Amino acid sequence: MARPRKPLLSRDRIVGAASALVDAEGLDAVSTRRLAAVLGVSGPSLYNHFRNKEEILDAVADAVSAQVDLSMFEESDPRDWREALHDWALSYRAALAAHPHIVPVLARGPGRRPAGLRVADAVFGAMVGAGWPPAQATRIGALMRYFITGSALGSFAGGFVDDETAYDPADYPHLGQAHLLADHRRQVDEGAFETGLRALLDGLALQYEPYARAVGDDAATVRPVPNRP
């Protein structure tokens, strides 16, 4: 009786297995030996697709970048630059929140990762199209990445233990309710992100006023480079 055929090894299978390991156990869980065991193949066969662990993690990170919604930067979208940045930031953070262990890789920047570069291209093109000077558009892209990835690196509320005795009022008179934060982790963290995001965009809007006057009444509209096939 013939043996059942093993599924063909592919980049997508390797990335899928690596993503599952990262999500479940963190970056240190990924190794060529571990992946080969999970996939039921020999270790050297992975090198037909990736040169090393770093390339695999880059591909995992890029798969997360590909989940970020960029529709708000399309030429046909009616949202202005501020609304577009707001909605994109929420989508970006949601993708990172679903895969928190890969955030340190994404925080290094897009490098040569295609999906990551598409994100950078979309944001930069939309900001320049809306009237921001290229230098300012670059700073906005950097600022947004710092803010979003930084917020995804850890939970503020989750950093407080669920133990009332840890907060002796003699030592910490203002932390009497801190032990309750862990029970409201999502509400606190998402609320903090939204508050910070709106404050950031308010500040950018003030800086944008001279550029809006310079380019006309429709300056606030996102006018990115045309969509590529």
Where are these regions (language model features)?
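Short, basic, alpha-helical segments at the C-terminal edge of helix-turn-helix-like DNA-binding modules
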Residues: A63-V68
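Helix-turn-helix
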Residues: R13, A17, L21-A59
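Short, Lys/Arg-enriched anionic-surface-contact patches
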Residues: A2-S10
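C-terminal peripheral helix-coil segments that are non-catalytic and often amphipathic
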Residues: A157-P229
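Amphipathic alpha-helical interaction segments
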Residues: R13, E55, D87, R118, ...
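Hydrophobic alpha-helical bundle segments that form small-molecule/ligand-binding pockets
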Residues: L117-P169, A182, L204-Q207
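Hydrophobic alpha-helical connector segments
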Residues: L70-A115, P134, M144
